[in-house]
A protein has these predicted regions:
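Core SAM-dependent methyltransferase catalytic element
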Residues: 223-241
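N-terminal, positively charged/glycine-rich alpha-helical extensions of SAM-dependent methyltransferases
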Residues: 1-26
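Conserved SAM-binding loop
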Residues: 50-56, 61-167, 195-198, 236-240
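Conserved alpha-helix/loop element of class I SAM-dependent methyltransferases that forms part
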Residues: 31-59
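Acceptor-substrate binding/catalytic loop of class I
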Residues: 160, 180-197
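Short, flexible, mixed-charge acidic loops at enzyme active sites
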Residues: 167-177
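Conserved hydrophobic residues forming the short capping helix/wall of the S-adenosyl-L-methionine
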Residues: 44, 101, 202
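Short alpha-helix
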Residues: 189-206, 212
Length: 241
């Protein structure tokens, strides 16, 4: 069995050359990155007891970035001292990520693979599932595979979209058709998942919830902030028991 959806992989492969163009098709992710990094550091610092203001605060931690794309999260995590493995089902994405890391003298272990194919049981302190679960083919298998790769007491961050009318209006109609922030067809609303449903799936896999936050975009300041509003974007932080 596989978690790969070939249509989804082809979709992102076609855009691979634009990963590091801050005004290109991945501009929304570039805008998203600061709040994602801030949140990961906040939760991880409390869990692993380190100081955020340390420029190498993630030193000694092994991180798996699933669906790493061109390396937008892998690179800052590496700069903060983590030992990062980035995997993606698109060979083109991995090629772009490797080239960009080399250009910036960053040592990142990039692999063209999927979590169910990695033979690395209990290997990682942190797993990053950022804007990935809404694109996989078999969510249950995907989450099971992630659980096996994470160390006991390790953290997993899952960022995705809630399955609500608001998310359909904002994330699909608004972002894809009206504002054209994303190419039409980037998201399939049927693959969005409610936070409580995701929590239940992870609870069944022996995870416990550490934190849940919404993420909302402020159009005036053109930035993302944490929010109590879970109706569209949210991040769920969980610990493997």
């Amino acid at each position: 069995m596989s978690t790969i959806n070939k249509d989804e992989i082809n979709k992102f492969t076609k855009m691979a050359d634009e990963w590091w163009d801050i005004n290109g098709k991945f501009k929304p992710l570039h805008m998203f990155n600061p709040i994602r990094i801030e949140y990961i550091l906040d939760i991880a610092s409390k869990h692993f007891n380190f100081k955020i203001n340390n420029p190498k605060s993630l030193n000694g931690l092994k991180i798996l970035d699933i669906g790493c794309g061109g390396g937008l999260i892998s690179e800052p995590m590496t700069r903060l001292g983590a030992e990062v493995t980035g995997i993606d089902a698109s060979a083109k994405n991995i090629e772009i990520a490797k080239l960009h890391a080399k250009k910036n003298n960053l040592k990142i272990n990039y692999l063209n693979s999927e979590p169910e194919k990695l033979n690395l049981k209990n290997e990682f302190d942190i797993i990053l599932n950022l804007e990935v679960v809404e694109h996989v083919e078999n969510l249950n298998l995907y989450l099971e595979s992630c659980q096996k790769l994470l160390k006991p007491k390790g953290l997993m961050f899952t960022a995705t979209l809630n399955k609500t009318l608001t998310s359909f209006i904002k994330a699909i109609i608004g972002a894809e058709y009206v504002l054209r922030w994303l190419p039409i067809g980037t998201h399939d609303w049927n693959k969005f998942i409610k936070p409580n449903e995701l929590e239940k799936k992870l609870l069944d896999l022996n995870f416990s919830t550490v934190n849940l936050t919404g993420l909302s975009f402020n159009p005036i300041f053109q930035e993302w902030k944490r929010s109590k509003d879970l109706s569209v974007n949210y991040i769920l932080a969980t610990e493997k028991n």
